[in-house]
Amino acid sequence: MSWIGGKKALRELIVRLFPLYYERYIEVFGGGGWVLFHKPPGNDFEVYNDFNGLLVNLYRCVRDKPEELMEALRYVLNAREDFDRIRSALARDSPASDVQRAAWFYQLIRYSYASGQTSFGSQPHDMRSNFSLIEQAHRRLAKVVIENKDFEKLLHQYAVSYTHLRAHETL
């Protein structure tokens, strides 16, 4: 998924720099999850974290409720009016289920220009074309702990001597 500050171009290099052995992998500033999704799953304890609650909710719904999420996305329209309505609802923190909020947020990312969530991108996009990606992400996230914490609190909770920490500031 496109995300501001994403590590798509660097993911291969980052994974090659991992030590041969580590017990924990903590994605401190998770964003689009490019490194986590590129890293082969193993026996290590994995944590994905991001401070953006909408993004974390989306990944939790992908992991825990993929069928409900895909159903909520099945018949959405690709229109500027819907984009504006969704953006407004999320900005107002309108009451909605976690799945509905995840579906809205995913629509906002997919329909916005450069995934920036601020302007309608006007490119037609059939959400159903992403269902296989949602299913793949669901399988990959099955054993991943997903957190929505400030990075200092996250590190205090999870960091131990054998942790492989990936924070973009260290690269």
Language-model segments: residues:
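S-adenosyl-L-methionine
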Residues: 1-20, 24
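Short coil/turn segments at beta-strand junctions that form active-site/ligand-binding loops
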Residues: 21-24, 44, 161-162
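Class I SAM-dependent methyltransferase core
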Residues: 27
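Conserved SAM-binding loop of SAM-dependent methyltransferases across substrates and taxa
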Residues: 34-42
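Class I S-adenosyl-L-methionine-dependent methyltransferase module
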Residues: 41-148, 152-153
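Short conserved loop adjoining the S-adenosyl-L-methionine
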Residues: 155-158
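Single conserved hydrophobic/aromatic residue that forms the stacking wall/gate
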Residues: 164-171
